[in-house]
């Protein structure tokens, strides 16, 4: 049975003051989530550090109905060998791939899209690079949000079963 794995947001290239990246560190019904700054320059980046090196197997991305990223690149990072204090800024990242999201015009911005990416990589860090937002009449500030990040692992093997990021 999967269980939640601890993580913290360790890097953010920008944030809306009302929706700081630190909101992702606690997953509660009252969490507001992170959002890119208004009229920001893309790409935007968010970095997550796990409590320990883990075998990441799946990423799920759930888009917001109107504030939609066009493309999100996924990277898994490892600490530099011999580094006594691993840091996101010094990590070696390997590109796992990307997801493209539908602009959602056909549903009149009523639906949310769920994407699942399967991969197998050991890492201490996860980097998500948001390339730009879909321009539409409801996204007046050209933003992309992340509502929550839930990371699960197998309790005994300490492998990720999935990471869910709601964008």
Show which residues each predicted segment covers.
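Hydrophobic side chains in beta-strands
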Residues: 11, 61, 76, 130, ...
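Hydrophobic beta-strand residues in large extracellular and virion-surface proteins
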Residues: 9, 48, 72-74, 99, ...
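Hydrophobic/aromatic beta-strand segments within beta-rich folds
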Residues: 45-48, 55-62, 110-146
């Amino acid at each position: 049975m999967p269980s939640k794995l601890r993580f913290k947001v360790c890097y953010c290239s920008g944030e809306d003051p009302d929706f700081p990246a630190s909101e992702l560190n606690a997953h509660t019904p009252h969490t507001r989530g992170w959002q890119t700054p208004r009229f920001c320059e893309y790409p935007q980046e968010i970095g997550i550090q796990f409590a320990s090196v883990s075998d990441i197997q799946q990423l799920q991305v759930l888009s917001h109905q109107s504030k939609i990223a066009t493309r999100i690149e996924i990277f898994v990072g490892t600490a530099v060998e011999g580094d006594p204090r691993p840091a996101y800024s010094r990590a070696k990242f390997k590109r796992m791939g990307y997801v493209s999201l539908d602009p959602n015009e056909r549903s009149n911005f009523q639906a949310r899209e769920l994407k699942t990416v399967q991969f197998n990589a050991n890492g201490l860090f996860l980097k998500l690079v948001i390339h730009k937002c879909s321009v539409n009449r409801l996204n007046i500030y050209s933003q992309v949000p992340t509502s929550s990040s839930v990371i699960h692992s197998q309790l005994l093997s300490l492998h990720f079963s999935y990471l869910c990021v709601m964008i």
